[in-house]
Protein backbone atom coordinates (compact mmCIF):
# COMPACT_ATOMS: atom_id res chain seq x y z
CA UNK A 1 0.00 0.00 0.00
CA UNK A 2 1.22 3.48 -0.85
CA UNK A 3 1.94 5.80 2.06
CA UNK A 4 3.29 9.15 3.16
CA UNK A 5 5.41 9.44 6.30
CA UNK A 6 5.55 12.83 7.99
CA UNK A 7 8.54 13.50 10.22
CA UNK A 8 10.34 16.31 12.01
CA UNK A 9 13.92 16.77 13.20
CA UNK A 10 14.23 16.45 16.96
CA UNK A 11 15.71 19.95 16.98
CA UNK A 12 12.57 21.31 15.31
CA UNK A 13 14.71 22.89 12.59
CA UNK A 14 13.10 21.15 9.63
CA UNK A 15 10.48 18.62 8.64
CA UNK A 16 10.28 16.03 5.89
CA UNK A 17 7.61 14.08 4.04
CA UNK A 18 8.59 10.88 2.21
CA UNK A 19 6.25 8.99 -0.09
CA UNK A 20 5.82 5.61 -1.69
CA UNK A 21 3.46 6.27 -4.62
CA UNK A 22 4.19 3.16 -6.68
CA UNK A 23 0.66 1.73 -6.76
CA UNK A 24 -0.83 5.18 -7.39
CA UNK A 25 1.26 5.79 -10.49
CA UNK A 26 0.99 2.20 -11.73
CA UNK A 27 -2.81 2.42 -11.60
CA UNK A 28 -2.74 5.76 -13.41
CA UNK A 29 -0.59 4.20 -16.13
CA UNK A 30 -2.99 1.27 -16.42
CA UNK A 31 -6.11 3.43 -16.62
CA UNK A 32 -4.69 5.87 -19.17
CA UNK A 33 -2.44 3.43 -21.07
CA UNK A 34 0.40 5.96 -21.00
CA UNK A 35 3.74 5.40 -22.69
CA UNK A 36 7.07 5.98 -20.95
CA UNK A 37 7.58 9.75 -20.88
CA UNK A 38 3.88 10.45 -20.38
CA UNK A 39 3.82 7.98 -17.48
CA UNK A 40 6.72 9.71 -15.71
CA UNK A 41 5.34 13.22 -16.26
CA UNK A 42 1.87 12.26 -15.02
CA UNK A 43 3.36 10.30 -12.12
CA UNK A 44 5.49 13.20 -10.92
CA UNK A 45 2.46 15.49 -11.03
CA UNK A 46 0.39 13.03 -8.99
CA UNK A 47 3.17 12.75 -6.39
CA UNK A 48 3.52 16.54 -6.19
CA UNK A 49 -0.19 16.85 -5.53
CA UNK A 50 -0.07 14.12 -2.88
CA UNK A 51 2.55 16.20 -1.06
CA UNK A 52 0.57 19.41 -1.48
CA UNK A 53 -2.64 17.78 -0.23
CA UNK A 54 -0.85 16.31 2.79
CA UNK A 55 0.06 19.88 3.75
CA UNK A 56 -3.59 20.99 3.89
CA UNK A 57 -6.17 20.66 6.65
CA UNK A 58 -9.90 19.96 6.74
CA UNK A 59 -11.72 18.75 3.64
CA UNK A 60 -9.80 20.83 1.13
CA UNK A 61 -9.58 19.79 -2.52
CA UNK A 62 -6.37 20.60 -4.37
CA UNK A 63 -6.03 20.89 -8.14
CA UNK A 64 -2.62 21.02 -9.81
CA UNK A 65 -2.35 21.96 -13.48
CA UNK A 66 0.98 21.70 -15.25
CA UNK A 67 0.33 23.61 -18.46
CA UNK A 68 3.03 23.33 -21.10
CA UNK A 69 3.25 24.25 -24.77
CA UNK A 70 5.10 21.16 -25.98
CA UNK A 71 4.43 17.44 -26.48
CA UNK A 72 2.67 16.60 -23.21
CA UNK A 73 0.05 19.34 -23.39
CA UNK A 74 -1.69 19.81 -20.03
CA UNK A 75 -1.38 17.55 -16.98
CA UNK A 76 -4.25 17.85 -14.50
CA UNK A 77 -4.44 16.33 -11.02
CA UNK A 78 -6.99 16.62 -8.22
CA UNK A 79 -6.31 15.44 -4.65
CA UNK A 80 -8.06 15.55 -1.29
CA UNK A 81 -6.77 15.53 2.26
CA UNK A 82 -7.70 11.86 2.74
CA UNK A 83 -4.86 10.61 0.57
CA UNK A 84 -6.82 10.22 -2.67
CA UNK A 85 -5.54 11.58 -5.97
CA UNK A 86 -6.61 11.34 -9.60
CA UNK A 87 -5.22 12.83 -12.78
CA UNK A 88 -4.66 12.67 -16.51
CA UNK A 89 -2.26 13.88 -19.19
CA UNK A 90 -3.46 15.23 -22.52
CA UNK A 91 -0.94 13.35 -24.64
CA UNK A 92 -0.61 9.82 -23.31
CA UNK A 93 1.66 8.69 -26.12
CA UNK A 94 4.96 10.52 -25.55
CA UNK A 95 7.55 7.75 -25.65
CA UNK A 96 11.04 9.25 -25.71
CA UNK A 97 13.73 6.65 -25.14
CA UNK A 98 15.64 6.62 -21.88
CA UNK A 99 19.04 8.25 -21.46
CA UNK A 100 22.18 6.17 -21.01
CA UNK A 101 21.55 6.14 -17.25
CA UNK A 102 17.99 4.90 -17.66
CA UNK A 103 16.31 8.23 -16.93
CA UNK A 104 13.16 9.19 -18.85
CA UNK A 105 13.25 12.72 -20.22
CA UNK A 106 10.41 15.03 -19.16
CA UNK A 107 11.46 18.69 -19.14
CA UNK A 108 12.14 19.15 -22.86
CA UNK A 109 8.68 17.81 -23.70
CA UNK A 110 6.85 19.98 -21.16
CA UNK A 111 8.01 23.18 -22.83
CA UNK A 112 7.25 26.65 -21.52
CA UNK A 113 4.19 27.20 -19.38
CA UNK A 114 2.83 27.44 -15.87
CA UNK A 115 2.40 25.48 -12.65
CA UNK A 116 -1.11 26.29 -11.43
CA UNK A 117 -2.57 25.34 -8.06
CA UNK A 118 -6.17 25.75 -6.95
CA UNK A 119 -6.95 25.03 -3.30
CA UNK A 120 -10.66 24.76 -2.56
CA UNK A 121 -11.34 25.05 1.15
CA UNK A 122 -15.07 24.46 0.64
CA UNK A 123 -15.92 28.07 1.46
CA UNK A 124 -16.69 29.14 -2.10
CA UNK A 125 -13.50 31.18 -2.43
CA UNK A 126 -10.74 28.90 -3.76
CA UNK A 127 -7.15 30.09 -3.61
CA UNK A 128 -5.41 30.10 -7.00
CA UNK A 129 -1.71 30.58 -7.65
CA UNK A 130 0.27 30.52 -10.89
CA UNK A 131 4.04 30.31 -11.21
CA UNK A 132 6.13 29.78 -14.35
CA UNK A 133 7.63 26.43 -15.22
CA UNK A 134 11.33 26.62 -14.40
CA UNK A 135 12.60 23.36 -15.90
CA UNK A 136 9.48 21.40 -16.79
CA UNK A 137 10.78 18.50 -14.68
CA UNK A 138 7.81 18.97 -12.28
CA UNK A 139 9.83 18.63 -9.06
CA UNK A 140 11.78 21.85 -9.55
CA UNK A 141 8.62 23.62 -10.70
CA UNK A 142 6.78 22.46 -7.57
CA UNK A 143 9.65 23.64 -5.35
CA UNK A 144 9.57 27.04 -7.05
CA UNK A 145 5.82 27.28 -6.41
CA UNK A 146 6.30 26.53 -2.71
CA UNK A 147 9.02 29.15 -2.43
CA UNK A 148 7.26 31.88 -4.41
CA UNK A 149 3.59 31.36 -3.55
CA UNK A 150 3.69 29.83 -0.08
CA UNK A 151 6.91 31.60 0.96
CA UNK A 152 8.30 28.27 2.14
CA UNK A 153 11.73 27.34 0.76
CA UNK A 154 11.55 23.63 0.05
CA UNK A 155 13.67 20.82 -1.34
CA UNK A 156 11.65 18.48 -3.54
CA UNK A 157 12.49 15.14 -5.13
CA UNK A 158 9.99 13.27 -7.33
CA UNK A 159 10.47 10.44 -9.77
CA UNK A 160 9.05 7.36 -11.42
CA UNK A 161 11.29 4.46 -12.42
CA UNK A 162 10.19 2.10 -15.18
CA UNK A 163 11.14 -1.53 -15.81
CA UNK A 164 12.45 -2.97 -19.07
CA UNK A 165 8.88 -3.07 -20.41
CA UNK A 166 8.26 0.59 -19.47
CA UNK A 167 5.85 -0.39 -16.69
CA UNK A 168 6.03 1.41 -13.35
CA UNK A 169 8.64 -0.24 -11.16
CA UNK A 170 8.72 2.27 -8.31
CA UNK A 171 7.47 5.81 -7.73
CA UNK A 172 7.87 8.19 -4.84
CA UNK A 173 9.41 11.35 -3.55
CA UNK A 174 10.17 13.67 -0.68
CA UNK A 175 9.74 17.22 0.55
CA UNK A 176 12.05 18.88 3.09
CA UNK A 177 11.24 22.29 4.59
CA UNK A 178 13.14 24.50 7.02
CA UNK A 179 10.90 25.55 9.91
CA UNK A 180 10.71 28.97 11.57
CA UNK A 181 13.28 29.38 14.32
CA UNK A 182 15.98 27.27 12.66
CA UNK A 183 19.45 28.69 13.31
CA UNK A 184 21.89 29.62 10.54
CA UNK A 185 24.05 26.70 11.60
CA UNK A 186 21.13 24.27 11.35
CA UNK A 187 20.12 25.63 7.94
CA UNK A 188 23.70 25.31 6.67
CA UNK A 189 23.88 21.72 7.93
CA UNK A 190 20.55 20.90 6.26
CA UNK A 191 21.63 22.46 2.95
CA UNK A 192 24.93 20.57 2.99
CA UNK A 193 23.15 17.27 3.59
CA UNK A 194 20.73 17.89 0.73
CA UNK A 195 23.59 18.76 -1.61
CA UNK A 196 25.30 15.49 -0.72
CA UNK A 197 22.16 13.36 -1.09
CA UNK A 198 22.24 10.68 -3.79
CA UNK A 199 19.98 11.28 -6.78
CA UNK A 200 16.29 10.57 -6.16
CA UNK A 201 16.38 7.83 -8.82
CA UNK A 202 19.19 6.08 -6.91
CA UNK A 203 17.28 6.25 -3.62
CA UNK A 204 14.06 4.98 -5.20
CA UNK A 205 15.98 2.01 -6.58
CA UNK A 206 16.85 0.96 -3.00
CA UNK A 207 15.22 -2.17 -1.57
CA UNK A 208 13.24 -0.06 0.93
CA UNK A 209 13.20 3.37 -0.67
CA UNK A 210 11.09 5.04 2.02
CA UNK A 211 13.67 4.20 4.68
CA UNK A 212 16.47 5.11 2.26
CA UNK A 213 14.91 8.54 1.74
CA UNK A 214 14.60 9.15 5.49
CA UNK A 215 18.18 8.07 6.09
CA UNK A 216 19.47 10.31 3.30
CA UNK A 217 17.50 13.31 4.59
CA UNK A 218 18.35 13.02 8.29
CA UNK A 219 21.68 11.20 8.34
CA UNK A 220 22.75 10.95 12.00
CA UNK A 221 20.34 13.67 13.09
CA UNK A 222 17.63 12.42 15.48
CA UNK A 223 14.08 12.76 14.18
CA UNK A 224 10.54 11.83 15.09
CA UNK A 225 7.95 10.16 12.88
CA UNK A 226 4.75 12.13 13.25
CA UNK A 227 2.37 10.01 11.18
CA UNK A 228 2.05 7.41 8.45
CA UNK A 229 -0.98 7.79 6.18
CA UNK A 230 -2.24 5.77 3.18
CA UNK A 231 -2.22 7.11 -0.37
CA UNK A 232 -4.12 5.89 -3.43
CA UNK A 233 -5.31 6.72 -6.93
CA UNK A 234 -9.08 7.07 -6.57
CA UNK A 235 -11.60 8.77 -8.83
CA UNK A 236 -14.88 10.08 -7.46
CA UNK A 237 -16.74 10.03 -10.79
CA UNK A 238 -20.19 8.43 -10.92
CA UNK A 239 -23.08 7.82 -13.29
CA UNK A 240 -25.17 10.23 -11.22
CA UNK A 241 -22.63 13.02 -11.67
CA UNK A 242 -22.57 12.64 -15.46
CA UNK A 243 -26.35 12.34 -15.55
CA UNK A 244 -26.54 15.68 -13.77
CA UNK A 245 -24.18 17.12 -16.40
CA UNK A 246 -26.43 15.86 -19.19
CA UNK A 247 -29.38 17.53 -17.48
CA UNK A 248 -27.72 20.90 -18.03
CA UNK A 249 -27.88 20.46 -21.82
CA UNK A 250 -30.76 21.87 -23.88
CA UNK A 251 -33.51 19.42 -24.85
CA UNK A 252 -32.53 19.81 -28.49
CA UNK A 253 -29.02 18.51 -27.78
CA UNK A 254 -30.37 15.50 -25.90
CA UNK A 255 -32.81 14.78 -28.72
CA UNK A 256 -29.97 15.00 -31.24
CA UNK A 257 -28.08 12.34 -29.28
CA UNK A 258 -31.14 10.09 -29.56
CA UNK A 259 -31.76 10.74 -33.25
CA UNK A 260 -28.16 10.70 -34.47
CA UNK A 261 -26.26 8.46 -32.04
CA UNK A 262 -29.03 6.33 -30.48
CA UNK A 263 -27.64 7.24 -27.08
CA UNK A 264 -24.53 8.73 -25.50
CA UNK A 265 -21.24 7.52 -24.09
CA UNK A 266 -19.36 9.67 -21.59
CA UNK A 267 -15.78 8.83 -20.66
CA UNK A 268 -14.27 10.19 -17.43
CA UNK A 269 -11.06 12.04 -18.26
CA UNK A 270 -9.52 11.21 -14.90
CA UNK A 271 -9.93 7.43 -14.85
CA UNK A 272 -11.24 6.35 -18.25
CA UNK A 273 -14.47 4.83 -16.91
CA UNK A 274 -17.19 4.74 -19.58
CA UNK A 275 -20.82 5.54 -18.82
CA UNK A 276 -23.51 4.52 -21.31
CA UNK A 277 -26.83 6.34 -21.65
CA UNK A 278 -29.27 4.65 -24.03
CA UNK A 279 -32.25 6.20 -25.81
CA UNK A 280 -34.58 5.48 -22.89
CA UNK A 281 -32.18 7.13 -20.44
CA UNK A 282 -31.99 10.28 -22.57
CA UNK A 283 -35.76 10.35 -23.11
CA UNK A 284 -36.22 10.19 -19.34
CA UNK A 285 -33.90 13.17 -18.94
CA UNK A 286 -35.87 15.12 -21.54
CA UNK A 287 -39.11 14.32 -19.70
CA UNK A 288 -37.56 15.40 -16.40
CA UNK A 289 -36.70 18.76 -17.97
CA UNK A 290 -40.29 19.29 -19.15
From Swiss-Prot:
Gene3D superfamilies: Hsp33 domain, HSP33 redox switch-like. GO terms for biological process: protein refolding. Redox regulated molecular chaperone. Protects both thermally unfolding and oxidatively damaged proteins from irreversible aggregation. Plays an important role in the bacterial defense system toward oxidative stress. Disulfide bonds join 235-237, 268-271. Belongs to the HSP33 family. Pfam families: HSP33. PANTHER family: 33 KDA CHAPERONIN. GO terms for molecular function: protein folding chaperone; unfolded protein binding. The lineage of its organism: Bacteria, Bacillati, Bacillota, Bacilli, Lactobacillales. GO terms for cellular component: cytoplasm. Its main location: cytoplasm. Under oxidizing conditions two disulfide bonds are formed involving the reactive cysteines. Under reducing conditions zinc is bound to the reactive cysteines and the protein is inactive. The keyword Chaperone applies. This is 33 kDa chaperonin. It is found in: Cytoplasm. InterPro entries: Heat_shock_Hsp33, Heat_shock_Hsp33_C, Heat_shock_Hsp33_N. Keywords: Chaperone, Cytoplasm, Disulfide bond, Redox-active center, Zinc.
Amino acid sequence: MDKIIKSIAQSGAFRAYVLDSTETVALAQEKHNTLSSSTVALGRTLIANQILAANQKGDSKITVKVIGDSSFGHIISVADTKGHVKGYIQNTGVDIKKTATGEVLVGPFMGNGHFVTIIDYGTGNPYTSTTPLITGEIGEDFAYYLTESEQTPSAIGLNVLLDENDKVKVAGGFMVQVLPGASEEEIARYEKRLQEMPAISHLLASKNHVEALLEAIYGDEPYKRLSEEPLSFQCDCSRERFEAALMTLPKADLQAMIDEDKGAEIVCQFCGTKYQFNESDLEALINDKA
